[in-house]
Amino acid sequence: MSQLVYFSSSSENTQRFIERLGLPAVRIPLNERERIQVDEPYILIVPSYGGGGTTGAVPRQVIRFLNDEHNRALLRGVIASGNRNFGEAYGRAGDVIARKCGVPWLYRFELMGTQSDIENVRKGVTEFWQRQPQNA
């Protein structure tokens, strides 16, 4: 199975979700000056920002990570967290990234997710990678 790459703000909601998920994952650093580069296809798990507005939904660190052409080329799908209080903007970062990068928006969950979200993502990620061509 290929990896997960995720970003978690200082609230650590996404970090807690990843810990409960129990799958291999690499974190995009909170410090914007630190950079990482991935070497295999991955699914991105990202929180949504901006309080429901149309701009600012994708964290700056994630934008910087995806602006690296090498990292962007290996992106295969996106999972977003958000807050249902923001209505239609719930999980908007996933929609933005999926549209701009041409990858599927696989799932969204609220805040740090429920046990059901953990099970759905674990199963969905496994099935997603099984359907991918070996050299994808």
Swiss-Prot record:
SUPFAM superfamilies in the record: Flavoproteins
GO BP annotations, alphabetical order: protein modification process
GO MF entries: FMN binding
Stored InterPro entries: Flavoprotein-like_sf (IPR029039), RNR_Ib_NrdI_bac (IPR020852), RNR_NrdI (IPR004465)
Record-linked Gene3D superfamilies: 3.40.50.360
Source organism superkingdom: Bacteria
Role summary: Probably involved in ribonucleotide reductase function.
Family label: Belongs to the NrdI family.
NCBIfam families in the record: nrdI
HAMAP family: NrdI (MF_00128)
Name this protein carries in UniProt: Protein NrdI
